[in-house]
């Protein structure tokens, strides 16, 4: 069975780990070489690196004729906190706009019911009501799209990821134990790995440092 390609998120995590583990500065060619060792396709390293730069997770500076890249764990944490803070502010703003529109719609409906006759003013109120309902629907859609960035939702997903990772690591440990047992019994572990599609570098999963 051929190995599955890495997702963009996993490529970003592995590339970010290169900087955090070394706490050093690198040129692009050095990052490409180190990325290849992390099973990231060479041709994609530059794009993955640029996505980290765009998200302000990796810093870059041109010195002379060369661009240097670096990222420290503390910088990455501050960057994520800044993004979460910005998204939370947007979320709060949309909630306030949604609340205001709800109040306006309730007022317009009440006003329309009390007038009792359909005159020009009432027609204007009806059109305004429809416009505000459409605006409210749009805001609620935007609010729903931002909800996954809510710090509470983010923390819940992070906790679930940890649970799944612990379960996966338990299976990894059991696989290593089984391979060791087979080796002690005289079996060819290389054949076992090949038959069961177990990679040589099978190791425990780890969450990136935030």
Swiss-Prot record:
What Pfam families is this protein classified in? LZ3wCH, Mnd1
Q: Which domain of life is it from?
A: Eukaryota
Q: Which GO terms describe its molecular function?
A: double-stranded DNA binding; recombinase activator activity
Where's it found, cell-wise?
Cytoplasm; Nucleus
InterPro entries registered for this protein in UniProt = LZ3wCH (IPR040661), Mnd1 (IPR005647), Mnd1_HTH (IPR040453)
Subunit (UniProt):
Interacts with meu13.
A GO cellular component entry from the record:
chromatin
Function recorded in the entry: Required for meiotic recombination.
Coiled-coil stretches are 77-148
Taxonomic lineage is: Eukaryota, Fungi, Dikarya, Ascomycota, Taphrinomycotina
The protein in question is named: Meiotic coiled-coil protein 7
Task: Tell me its family.
Answer: Belongs to the MND1 family.
Task: Give the UniProt record's GO annotations in the biological process aspect.
Answer: meiotic joint molecule formation; meiotic strand invasion involved in reciprocal meiotic recombination; reciprocal meiotic recombination
Q: What is its main location?
A: cytoplasm
Q: Which UniProt keywords apply?
A: Coiled coil, Cytoplasm, Meiosis, Nucleus
């Amino acid at each position: 069975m051929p190995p599955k390609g890495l997702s963009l998120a996993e490529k970003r995590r592995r590339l970010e780990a290169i900087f955090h583990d070394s706490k050093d500065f690198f040129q692009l060619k050095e990052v490409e070489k180190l990325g290849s060792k992390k099973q990231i396709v060479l041709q994609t390293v530059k794009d993955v690196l640029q996505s980290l730069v765009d998200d302000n997770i990796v810093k870059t500076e041109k010195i002379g004729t060369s661009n240097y890249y670096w990222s420290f764990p503390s910088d990455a944490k501050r960057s994520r906190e800044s993004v979460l803070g910005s998204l939370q502010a947007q979320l709060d703003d949309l909630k306030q706009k949604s609340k205001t529109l709800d109040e306006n719609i309730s007022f317009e409906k009440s006003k329309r019911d009390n007038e009792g006759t359909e005159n020009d003013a009432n027609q204007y109120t009806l059109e305004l009501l429809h416009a505000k309902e459409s605006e409210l629907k749009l805001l609620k859609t935007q609010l729903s799209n931002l909800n996954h960035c809510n710090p509470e939702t983010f923390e819940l997903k992070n906790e679930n990821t940890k649970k799944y990772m612990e379960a996966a690591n338990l299976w990894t440990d059991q696989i290593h134990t089984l391979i060791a047992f087979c080796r002690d019994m005289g079996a060819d572990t290389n054949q076992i790995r090949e038959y069961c599609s177990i990679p040589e570098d099978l190791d425990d999963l780890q969450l990136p440092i935030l």
